[in-house]
């Protein structure tokens, strides 16, 4: 009889719910383990089969750690603010709250049906005012610390959509949605000073147990580089152009400067002759996103301003150009171009027939830029020096002339924090009519997002909140001064920056979380999620955590000690699953047809957890067949315990059982679930080969299977005669001595030809080996009628019989 998954899974899910089996108690004296999933955005589509892969991995570890006696925190919640809900509301006229609530109900049902051991009493939802009260509170702390400020920033403004778009939402100067024209336009925005923490964010990566590739992505995003800031005087004016360069040693080869079209000096230094061309170029550049402008493959464009600067070391006059590949947001918004030794500058110089001066020997600058090492030439006092020595000397010379200094630069920009959208956390700031600005008093938090059916963009560049007078207009009760609330909202990243802290104390009305509880649970011991969050979410969360650490609110410098990225589950044809390809697999269907345990087992057995692997119906069926074999081994047709399960140990499974406990334990520690499952299969195969199976071994097996397939685990545990849940049963242990086989297989040869393979005890003497060999039927037949001349026995290896 195969097991009835629908019946069994429902039974145990109800049991766990009614008994609050997975409720985490704040027993601060017990050893702890905090296993965290990246909480999902509850979309209208519901869960897909990619979600359970990471969730199953953390669930296995959570269940395993409970059995090892750990106090486990394993929570779940919803990252529910953001554009898709707002877009749905705009398209349908429905309230994003209703849409979000309905989606969460679907997600929660699906997650519960997969048997994950979450403590639902700790559920959080970023759109719940009791949650975002603390998101707003953190913003106020950032503001008070000088880390939140208003700045005029060039943004992608789309008048037709009435909003600012991210770089990713702009393609070839038009909006991805609707194809409307997009312009670069300076607008006042809230910005968070993440750059203040750049060095810490970089240095502390070394202490984290994260994949090296992911750490490298963060290092590259922060992009720390050492070099020099250099000042070029603009000829015949008071102006100066400041540039940052990592190669100040090549300054004698700087034959022109390039400014971004938005650079503050452009309009004042451009000569009358070039004003029209410069203006036209600036207009064109404003239609492009930063991504388009810096695309290495695109053809270089630019315009001469008519102005010249003076090279501070050579004294030569150099032309000043503008070009859109230089961004105002990076460095100083200006570069010194050294075409002989930089590919991009070389391409630009060749296109516009500009001077190319070789200053490092070793290449042929007639054909290409030389970017290798070499001695300096045509470089005054730097001649003959190698790179490092020349860099040091160049900085020294610039400092002596007051024209430069050593400087560290970062690719990392401050975090543009405001969104002109409705469905987000209101920013708790009031702008007063006298030009001052204050945050909302903490005792008035949460500042509620007003309910409205008018959520279309305002058209002015402000968020739809600007249309709600009752929200916007305020009067100071003490002074009578009028003010306007900030109408921009926070980005979707805000709520996910700190949710792992709220899980620790989700119902606390007086503080973000109790300091003692934070001390007990932090840092997160295991965080599993997709690699798509490698930079932004993880960098932003680390930044907020470091600020909270400096404020004495959290006790650790880092939030997530160990991080792991699960791979992607592809469609059967090795393609990414997508609605348009029609190859998306709904977990609901699998739970119905094969069972949640089969889905969990299969996703863990597909291959290494971090690999991208194609879905296979055959593989799914194979996983179900394995669970059926386990069931049939232990349970009779009539549902009673098989008579094969006995209470006496005939030792036949000693070795394979102890090997299995060791292998599964070791593999769980390294998240090697696919090889752990292989070993469980080996054990079951061995059980089918023997007449009797020792009951404690089957109990140990069921304990190891239960974290992967918890419903069948609970059911088999009860069939084995236990009334309590398997959840908190002690994890099996193994005996080192029994891992080693006390038997060996020897070969028996007659006149050099193999005649038999025999298993014998390891400590069998030579004499006994000879006796055993000579009494073997095959050997007897081979030597019948012959005289035995010699018998050679090599302990634990072979017996060779010479007969004539």
Swiss-Prot record:
Keywords: Aminoacyl-tRNA synthetase, ATP-binding, Cytoplasm, Ligase, Nucleotide-binding, Protein biosynthesis. The keyword Cytoplasm applies. Its EC number is 6.1.1.4. One of its GO terms (molecular function) is aminoacyl-tRNA deacylase activity. One of its GO terms (biological process) is leucyl-tRNA aminoacylation. A motif ('KMSKS' region) lies at residues 576-580. It is found in: Cytoplasm. ATP binds at residue 579. It catalyses: tRNA(Leu) + L-leucine + ATP = L-leucyl-tRNA(Leu) + AMP + diphosphate. A motif ('HIGH' region) lies at residues 40-51. Its main location: cytoplasm. Belongs to the class-I aminoacyl-tRNA synthetase family. PANTHER family: LEUCINE--TRNA LIGASE, MITOCHONDRIAL, LEUCYL-TRNA SYNTHETASE. HAMAP family: Leu_tRNA_synth_B. This is Leucine--tRNA ligase. It comes from Staphylococcus aureus (strain bovine RF122 / ET3-1).
């Amino acid at each position: 009889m195969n097991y009835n998954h629908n019946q069994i899974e429902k039974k145990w899910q109800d049991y766990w719910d009614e008994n609050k089996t997975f409720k985490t108690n704040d027993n601060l004296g017990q050893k702890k383990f905090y296993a965290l999933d990246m909480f999902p955005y509850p979309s209208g589509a519901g869960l897909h089969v990619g979600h359970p892969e990471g969730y199953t991995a953390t669930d296995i570890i959570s269940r395993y750690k409970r059995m090892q006696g750990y106090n486990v925190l394993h929570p779940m919640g919803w990252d529910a603010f953001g554009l898709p809900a707002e877009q749905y509301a705009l398209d349908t006229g429905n309230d994003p709250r209703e849409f979000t609530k309905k989606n969460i109900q679907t997600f929660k049902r699906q997650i519960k049906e997969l048997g994950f051991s979450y403590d639902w009493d700790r559920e959080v939802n970023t759109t719940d005012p009791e949650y975002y009260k603390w998101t707003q509170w953190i913003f106020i702390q950032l503001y008070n610390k000088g880390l939140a400020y208003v700045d005029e920033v060039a943004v992608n403004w789309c008048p037709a959509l009435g909003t600012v778009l991210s770089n990713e939402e702009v393609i070839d100067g038009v909006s991805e949605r609707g194809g409307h024209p997009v312009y670069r336009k300076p607008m006042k925005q809230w910005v968070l000073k993440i750059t203040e923490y750049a060095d810490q964010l970089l240095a502390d990566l070394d202490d984290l147990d994260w994949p090296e590739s992911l750490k490298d992505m963060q290092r590259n995003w922060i992009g720390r580089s050492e070099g020099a800031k250099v000042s070029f005087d603009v000829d015949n004016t008071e102006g100066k152009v400041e540039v940052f360069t990592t190669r100040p040693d090549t300054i004698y080869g700087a034959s022109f400067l390039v400014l971004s079209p938005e650079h503050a000096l452009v309009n004042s230094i451009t000569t009358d002759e070039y004003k029209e061309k410069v203006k036209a170029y600036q207009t064109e550049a404003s239609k492009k996103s930063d991504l388009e402008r810096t695309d290495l493959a695109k053809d270089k464009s630019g315009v001469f301003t008519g102005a010249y600067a003076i090279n501070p070391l050579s004294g030569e006059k150099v032309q000043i150009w503008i070009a859109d590949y230089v961004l105002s947001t990076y460095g100083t918004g200006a570069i010194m171009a050294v075409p002989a030794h930089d590919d991009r500058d070389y391409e630009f110089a060749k296109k516009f027939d500009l001077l190319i001066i070789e200053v490092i020997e070793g290449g042929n600058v007639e054909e290409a830029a030389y970017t290798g090492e070499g001695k300096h030439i045509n470089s005054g006092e730097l001649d003959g020096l190698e790179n490092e020595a020349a860099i040091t000397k160049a900085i020294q010379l610039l400092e002596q002339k007051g024209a430069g200094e050593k400087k560290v630069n970062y690719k990392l920009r401050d975090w543009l924090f405001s969104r002109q959208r409705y469905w987000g956390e209101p920013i708790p700031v009031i702008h007063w009519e006298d030009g001052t600005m204050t945050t909302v008093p903490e005792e008035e938090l949460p500042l509620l997002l007003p309910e409205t059916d008018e959520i279309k963009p305002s058209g002015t560049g402000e968020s739809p909140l600007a249309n709600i007078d009752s929200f916007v207009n305020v009067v100071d009760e003490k002074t009578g001064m009028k003010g306007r609330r900030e109408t921009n909202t926070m980005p979707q990243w805000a709520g996910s920056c700190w949710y792992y802290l709220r899980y620790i104390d989700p119902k606390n009305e007086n503080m973000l979380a109790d300091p003692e509880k934070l001390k007990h649970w932090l840092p997160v011991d295991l965080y599993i999620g997709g690699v798509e969050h490698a930079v932004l979410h993880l960098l932003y969360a680390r930044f907020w955590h470091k600020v909270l650490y400096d404020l004495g609110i959290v006790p650790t410098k880092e939030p997530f000690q160990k991080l792991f990225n699960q791979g992607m589950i592809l469609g059967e044809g090795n393609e990414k699953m997508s609605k348009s390809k029609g190859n998306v697999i709904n977990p609901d269907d699998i739970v119905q047809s094969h069972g949640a345990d089969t889905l969990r087992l299969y996703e863990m057995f597909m291959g290494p957890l971090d690999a991208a692997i194609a879905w296979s119906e055959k593989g799914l069926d194979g996983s179900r067949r394995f669970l059926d074999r386990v069931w049939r081994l232990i349970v009779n047709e009539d549902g009673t315990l098989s008579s094969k399960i006995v209470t006496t140990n005939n030792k036949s499974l000693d070795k394979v059982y102890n090997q299995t406990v060791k292998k599964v334990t070791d593999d769980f520690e390294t998240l090697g679930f696919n090889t752990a499952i292989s070993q469980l299969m080996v054990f079951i195969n061995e059980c089918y080969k023997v007449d009797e199976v020792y009951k404690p071994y089957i109990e140990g097996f069921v304990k190891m299977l239960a974290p992967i397939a918890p419903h069948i685990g609970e059911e088999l545990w009860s069939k084995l005669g236990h009334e309590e849940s398997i959840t908190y049963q002690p994890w099996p242990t193994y005996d080192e001595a029994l891992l080693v086989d006390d038997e060996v297989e020897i070969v028996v040869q007659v006149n050099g030809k193999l005649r038999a393979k025999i298993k014998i005890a390891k400590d069998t003497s030579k004499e006994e080996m000879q006796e055993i060999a000579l009494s073997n039927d095959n050997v007897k037949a081979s030597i019948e009628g012959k005289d035995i001349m010699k018998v050679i026995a090599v302990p634990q290896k072979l017996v060779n019989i010479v007969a004539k």
